[in-house]
């Protein structure tokens, strides 16, 4: 992994959509993918017909920390990732997975943790985490021209609800939908997932 940056991730989207021949399309961003999607939509306004953002933020955890305690909490997870990512201890995997999907079944939590561990090294995961926590696309939000739907669960343990509200407030004309739930990653058995899909369907049909 040579470059880990917002610009590199935007170029990744460019590469994929060019390869499949998409000229204009709806773009869905989740978690840190929301900031990346915002950056893409601003760089290529003619290509994004609709922007859909779930569980995201404009400012990463390091940038939006209101005090030293909040900053240290965010950095504590970075330390855990760097030191415990490849560890066989179930304690780290349980902590990490339960943050993202507290309503997950035992099987879902274990599969998620194992997938994370196998798909990248501890050092790459750390660099990825540090980069996303330093993202700030606040200045890009007013430049988004695509119709935008922003959704966020109220009890998200990874990205605070207020971060989602801030994201929506900065985008002209964005619709913000507050959802009852706690899973940062939508789960099949979670009732809120059906609501998310319905909101997207209605939004795209307008």
Segments (PLM) and residue ranges:
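Short alpha-helix in the alpha/beta-hydrolase fold that links the catalytic acid
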Residues: 146, 160-169
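Short beta-strand/loop motif that positions the catalytic acidic residue
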Residues: 144, 150-152
């Amino acid at each position: 992994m040579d470059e880990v940056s917002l610009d590199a991730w935007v170029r990744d989207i460019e590469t994929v959509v060019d390869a499949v021949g998409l000229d204009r399309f709806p773009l869905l961003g989740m978690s840190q993918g929301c900031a990346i999607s915002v950056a893409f939509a601003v760089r290529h306004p003619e290509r994004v017909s609709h922007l859909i953002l779930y569980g995201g933020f404009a400012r990463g955890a390091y940038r939006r920390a209101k005090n030293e305690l909040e900053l240290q909490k965010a950095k504590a997870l970075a330390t855990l990732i760097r030191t415990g990512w490849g560890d066989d201890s179930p304690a780290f995997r349980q902590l990490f997975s339960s943050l993202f999907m507290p309503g997950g079944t035992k099987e879902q939590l274990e599969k998620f943790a194992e997938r994370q561990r196998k798909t990248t090294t501890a050092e790459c995961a750390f660099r990825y985490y540090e980069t996303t926590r330093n993202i700030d696309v606040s200045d890009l939000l007013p430049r988004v021209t695509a119709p935008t739907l922003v959704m966020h669960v109220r009890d998200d343990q990874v990205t605070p609800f207020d971060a989602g509200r801030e994201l929506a407030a900065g985008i002209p004309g964005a619709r913000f939908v507050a959802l009852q739930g706690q899973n940062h990653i939508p789960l099949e058995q979670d009732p809120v997932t059906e609501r998310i899909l319905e909101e997207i369907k209605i939004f795209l049909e307008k």
